[in-house]
């Protein structure tokens, strides 16, 4: 089968690999759509480690990685599989790990408890982002009862735009989207944000100062944006983005009653929470897909992400 592999910084090839063998508890999925996780794709493509570990990344990257957000059709099931049948439309819920083969491939084999069925009304392009929504779910749930509250999202890239949808779905009275790119703020409004704030302007910061947030999800991955969240939230800040740069705490933050959570593990309850939203039609990730390209144009797609000309890119194996 055809698999995309990053061989070195800014160099990739389509390599041939055997179709995965299906274990008893696994399903074999023919991949129909695979969307980028921009931070991970950009860092591996440019020779930077997303977690800032010494000696990483190590090339060549395992074939198919960092692809981990995919959807497709079940074409084979293991002997112990009970919840799926061939022909089911599914998406992955969990990545395969950084040292394992990734999902930029024609076929992937996954344990049945790490995939979910897609409702008929959900496209492959939208369903491929289920893994990202599953990652967001524990952060949104950790914020607690948001009914009637003013809640923020810093950084409205793909995760931030989904967070806007999720916060609105759980009943936040005001969902404030914050970014420095006007075009991203416009997308956030279309995704359900009740207010948008350009945090790169004095006027934007003044607006937050005048009306602080009661909770916030940081999806930026930037120290400066996290600082904005910390400075203007009187409650819990859930840090979803992998942070690069620094943010500082002071006595003022202590007096605000600020709480911070990071890197939350997912539970079955988180997944159920997210899938219920999907089934109710409250999550739509298709609007996040800015370009659709074959594997052969991977370099072009990642450059769109680097240049901020795309939110997510959907790649097709054939």
Language-model segment annotations:
Residues 56-63, 68, 83, 92-154:
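NAD(P)H dinucleotide-binding glycine-rich loop of Rossmann-like/cofactor-binding domains
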Residues 20-35, 49-96:
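Glycine-rich beta-strand-centered segment in the early N-terminal region that forms part
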Residues 3, 268-318:
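C-terminal hydrophobic helical "lid"/dimerization subdomain
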Residues 223-282, 317-318:
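Glycine-rich phosphate-binding loop and adjacent beta-alpha segment
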Residues 123-201:
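Mid-domain Rossmann-like dinucleotide-binding core that forms the NAD(H)/NADP(H) cofactor-binding site
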Residues 91, 217, 238:
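N-terminal Rossmann-like NAD(P) cofactor-binding module of classical short-chain dehydrogenase/reductase
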Residues 201-211:
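Short amphipathic alpha-helix with an adjacent loop that forms part of the alpha/beta core around
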Residues 42-50:
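Short Gly/aromatic-enriched secondary-structure transition segments
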């Amino acid at each position: 089968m055809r698999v995309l592999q990053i061989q070195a910084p800014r160099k990739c090839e389509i390599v041939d690999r055997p179709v995965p063998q299906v274990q008893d508890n696994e399903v074999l999925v023919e991949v129909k759509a695979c969307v980028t996780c921009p931070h991970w794709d950009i860092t591996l493509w440019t020779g930077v480690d997303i977690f800032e570990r010494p000696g990483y990344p190590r090339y060549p990257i395992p074939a198919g990685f960092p692809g981990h957000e995919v959807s497709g059709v079940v074409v084979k099931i293991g002997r112990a599989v009970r919840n799926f049948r061939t022909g089911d439309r599914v998406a992955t819920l969990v990545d395969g790990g950084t040292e394992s083969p990734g999902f930029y491939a024609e076929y992937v084999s996954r344990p049945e408890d790490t995939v979910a069925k897609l409702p008929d009304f959900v496209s492959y392009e939208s369903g491929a982002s289920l893994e990202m929504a599953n990652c967001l779910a524990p952060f949104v749930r950790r914020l607690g009862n948001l009914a009637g509250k003013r809640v923020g999202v810093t950084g409205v890239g793909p995760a931030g735009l989904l967070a806007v949808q999720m916060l609105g779905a759980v009943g936040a009275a005001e969902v404030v989207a914050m970014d420095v790119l006007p075009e991203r703020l416009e997308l956030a409004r279309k995704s359900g944000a009740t207010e948008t704030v350009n945090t790169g302007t004095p006027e934007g910061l003044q607006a937050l100062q005048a009306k602080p947030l009661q909770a916030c999800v940081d999806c930026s991955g930037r120290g400066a944006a996290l600082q904005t969240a910390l400075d203007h939230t009187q409650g819990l800040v859930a840090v979803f983005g992998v942070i690069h740069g620094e943010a500082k705490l002071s006595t003022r933050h202590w007096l605000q009653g600020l709480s911070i959570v990071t890197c939350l593990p997912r539970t079955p309850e988180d997944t159920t929470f997210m899938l219920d939203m999907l089934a109710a039609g409250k999550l739509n990730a298709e609007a996040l897909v800015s370009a659709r390209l074959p594997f052969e144009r991977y370099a072009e797609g990642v450059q769109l992400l680097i240049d901020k000309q795309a939110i997510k890119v959907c790649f097709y194996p054939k």
